[in-house]
């Protein structure tokens, strides 16, 4: 990757997206560096958008594993990513987007109209089932089937765009 960045150093560019010529599922996004995904898998489009969320917006994965190999996020430290929290410094995250009286943790939404938009504090994110929270029941940073980023991720991406354009 360093060679690619060096090669592009004299050319004005905004972001690197690398498409691998394979139908194997996968991808990765390194914040402030690049997006990598496979070009011929049926889930290419949602995966490249998800990985772009990491590499451009600094967004965290909002999914959790049944058995995380080791906690990536200690529960007594607030993650730097804007879309997950341990509640240590929640006021710096999306607390201002909660409706008054929203319970913490928030029960997952079952109404299809609300699963992508109802901002709360839903447990299970950052690869961990307990102690790490995400802003909505579902989001592009959690599942490939989500049609959009959640409101918290959208706000964060908008702030990043404004940082570079205003």
Predicted regions and their residues:
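Active-site-proximal segment of zinc-dependent metalloprotease catalytic domains
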Residues: 1-67
């Amino acid at each position: 990757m360093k060679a690619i960045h060096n090669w592009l150093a004299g050319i004005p560019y905004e972001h690197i997206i690398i498409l691998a010529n394979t139908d194997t599922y996968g991808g990765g996004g390194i914040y402030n560096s690049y997006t990598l995904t496979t070009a011929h898998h049926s889930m290419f489009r949602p995966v490249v958008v998800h990985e772009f969320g990491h590499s451009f917006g600094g967004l965290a994965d909002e999914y959790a594993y049944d058995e995380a190999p080791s906690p990536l996020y200690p529960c007594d430290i607030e993650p730097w990513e804007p879309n997950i929290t341990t509640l240590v410094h929640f006021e710096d995250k999306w607390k201002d987007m909660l409706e008054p009286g929203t319970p913490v943790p928030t029960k997952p939404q079952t109404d299809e109209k609300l699963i992508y938009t109802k901002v709360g504090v839903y447990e299970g994110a950052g690869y961990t089932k307990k102690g790490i929270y995400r802003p909505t029941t579902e989001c592009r940073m959690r599942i490939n089937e989500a049609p959009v980023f959640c409101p918290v991720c959208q706000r964060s991406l908008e702030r990043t765009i404004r940082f570079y354009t205003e």
